[in-house]
Amino acid sequence: MMEVRPTTLIDHINSPADLRALKPEQLPQVCRELRRYILEVLSVTPGHLGSSLGAVDFTVALHYVFDTPYDRIVWDVGHQAYSHKILTGRREDFRHLRQWGGISGFPSPKESEYDTFPAGHASNSISAALGMAVASAAKDEKRKVIAVIGDGSMTGGMAFEGLNNASSFPNNLLIILNDNNMSIDRNVGGLNRYMVDILTSKTYNTIRYDLYKGLRKINLISETNRKNLLRFNNSFKALLARESNLFEGFSIRYFGPVDGNNVLRLVEVLNQIKDMAGPKILHLRTIKGKGYSPAEKQATIWHAPGEFDIKSGERKKGENKPEPPKFQDVFGHTLVELADRDERVVGVTPAMPTGCSMTFLMKKYPNRAYDVGIAEGHAVTFSAGLAKEGLIPFCNIYSSFIQRGYDQVIHDVALSGSHVVICLDRAGLVGEDGATHHGVFDMAFLRCVPDIVVASPLNEHELRNLMLTAYKGYDGPMVIRYPRGKGVLTDWRNTPRLVEIARGRCLTEGEAIAFLSIGPIGNMVQKVVERLAEKGVSAAHYDMVFLKPLDEEMLHGIAKKFDTIISVEDGCIQGGFGSAVMEFMADHDYHPRIRRVGVPDRFIGQGSVPEQYADCGMDADSLLHLTEELLLHP
């Protein structure tokens, strides 16, 4: 790894207090140095580049104007908060971003007092910040609370729930809207700047609030008329600005747009509005990838580009040899094949078309692929509506995000028996994104839902088979879970075949011990079985394929043959696949010795998947050791 050294100013910033000791005219240099440092680190330690570069200026401004950590900053998603981490005492640790034993790629309260609320998922910042603001007011504190949310996260319903509730409280809540994708129409530039200056002036706001408050106290104006005057005031502003503003419809004062990449202007505006009473929103226009030309020109590619050469802008590639495809691409190609067969086949994704390869369908059949925004619950119910009218939706959602649509899976899909295929991408441990993004809970919370099928393929062929079966061989709700990244087969384009629901298969016959696995982790288990065979241990291996319903015929046979069973899953062992096996054995009065291998009852940190497997005792060496211990002590 290249030696990375921060430069002049930021080398002496170990806390926001150090930042606030600088002169305002030094802040642009701080921003340049932060961008340079982020580029140098991320070129060799992959992370979220584009959003972090775009957020540098307003991050510096927030820590310069507000008294953090007493004042709270709540980050939505948090992948844009790299400069925040650098400024809050983690400059050196930043070199080990998203690594095992290093710092998280997202804000984490366990890591720093400046990380006020855990982040990773979208649209929750306003609700969390509002709760903090209300609590601070209840304790008669003067703390200011700031929520930082992107325009993408504003597509999530929870953000609007927070906005709606915020209007009920007079607390000093500031919402920073980081708009880097033109999601909100542009305001008039010169007039808008004038309006921001006027509306943020101390004189204007003091007179405005004191007048209404005083009039009410001396009963010269009723509450109704006071509100009417406020409406008149808002209408007058709208007339001047030639627009009607969504946020002020929530009774939240709106300022902007402001150039979110002009740190001096941001300091000026933040100082003007920070002491205003009531909830308010500051709309910032930022450029994703700001300061690095390749990232500015291709925002999607440079969101998380992997390793790259800073000077040339070329992303580093692996060796030029045949490799298995990503499970995501197999899903994308197979979905297009099914869509070629049947015009009823459609795709749905909540804002992850590139990540899940829904883009393949979008390119060929743009009118049959729907990106519904960051709205997982809506995506599920939208799919149920499509199915109700005879379409066959493949709803692709990351496993960690289906948690946000659990009620809809039960109420709107399973209860009605809708022919919806839910494909859970990034199931299992996911590596560097860490605890907020692991897809380890889905098997536990889905297997208790009636009238739903849950399956996980061993490899790419099985994924294609299950997708065909979900489309043609089963007319109810079905969940297919598969991991992030590459599969195991280079020759993966098989002709898909229908598979029987609730039917597993024996991969290796054996006598001494039985392994039961589900999903791609079975490939690692198979290698363990082969290593045991080299040592003279006859181990059997069964790929169960279906979590729900289980292959009970196969389980009866296993229970009658083996005294010792090891279940292996890439998911939480509490209530997961292994628990399902144990429940079956108990229900049928079988008493084998069972050991469950999976994710233990704790949150697993960031790092590589092999490191996470080893930490959880799910790697090949741990399985070998466990097997030998069980056989030595029957």
Swiss-Prot record:
Entry note: cofactor: Binds 1 Mg(2+) ion per subunit. Binds 1 thiamine pyrophosphate per subunit.
Quaternary structure annotation from Swiss-Prot or TrEMBL: Homodimer.
The EC designation for this entry is: 2.2.1.7
Q: Which reaction does it catalyse?
A: D-glyceraldehyde 3-phosphate + pyruvate + H(+) = 1-deoxy-D-xylulose 5-phosphate + CO2
Stated role? Catalyzes the acyloin condensation reaction between C atoms 2 and 3 of pyruvate and glyceraldehyde 3-phosphate to yield 1-deoxy-D-xylulose-5-phosphate (DXP).
Give the molecular function GO annotations.
Answer: 1-deoxy-D-xylulose-5-phosphate synthase activity; magnesium ion binding; thiamine pyrophosphate binding
Q: Does the keyword Magnesium apply?
A: yes
Protein name as annotated: 1-deoxy-D-xylulose-5-phosphate synthase
